Amino acid sequence: MEDYKQTLLLLISTPLYAVLIGLEMIMSSIHHKHLYTVKDTFTNVYLTSLNFGLELLIRTFCLGFLAYFFQFHFISIENPYLYWATLLILQDIAFYFEHRVDHYCRFFWAVHVTHHSSEKYNLTTGFRSSVFQPLYRFVYFIPLAIFGFKPLDIMFMYSATQIYGILIHTQYIKKLGFLEYFMATPSHHRVHHASNTIFLDKNMGMVFIIWDKIFGTFASEDDLKNEEIRFGLTKNIERPNHLVDIVFHEWVNIANDMKMNIPFTTKLKYLFMPPGWSHDGSRKTSKQLREELKGEL
């Protein structure tokens, strides 16, 4: 049954991606938007292949890990509609907190930064996967197993929501009316990928935006005044399509920071504090940058 469901997802998503990416490429060419380059697109596909390969390698371990916690579950939802709807909601909450940690802890940001490293923004940006994220993502699904959701169903739901998460990486869909109030839309996700100061570390949800509104990480595309939205990092890497640089550049930066002649506890802060933290104030976190911007207005 599991193979059937996973195969069905691939059979649906693969041609869907191909058609929509092809259409976006054509529209980009017609409108001279230059949303795509060959190198950037190839890099995105290559990175998602590495991510997918690692997921396959450790899939059995992840399922066994979650199965261990599933044996302690204390809730059973019998109604299948309620079961899948609840799993969707709880899985998206789990993703929200994983994503938030990825942005606010430099150790995990060093993994996740790969996804934000392109200055281009198109449907294939959703493929620009954080290569090593499968090594720890499943830990966030422990509560779902304890709440009575089967490990295979948890993994299936994550794969299904990933399809939606990829499709919102586009500049061609502007606003989606009332869906903007509770869904993570293309507009909301453009904010997430923006490097403009007011948008840093915002809009973490993959399917629903309500978690961002509840936990204070929401920003609207309309909040940006008198400047164009910029994609990428606050300091973009010199070789954005060089595999080693994309995957490891932040680890190199962390290593250089930890080589400084500072106390060991301070060294650890360079590993676990938010990106941009520095012991001497020479760099700033996203929160500090926003506060500084507010002071200038």
Task: Go through each PLM region and give its residues.
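Hydrophobic transmembrane alpha-helical segments in integral membrane proteins
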Residues: 1-17
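Helix-boundary and loop/linker segments of multi-pass membrane transporters
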Residues: 2-6, 34-40, 73-80, 114-115, ...
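Central hydrophobic cores of alpha-helical transmembrane segments in multi-pass inner-membrane proteins
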Residues: 16-28, 63, 88-94
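Membrane-interface helix-loop junction between the first two transmembrane segments
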Residues: 22-42
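Membrane-embedded catalytic scaffold of the fatty acid hydroxylase/desaturase
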Residues: 49-61, 73, 77-229
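Hydrophobic membrane-embedded segments
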Residues: 65-73
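Cytosolic-facing loops and C-terminal tails of multi-pass membrane proteins
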Residues: 225-297
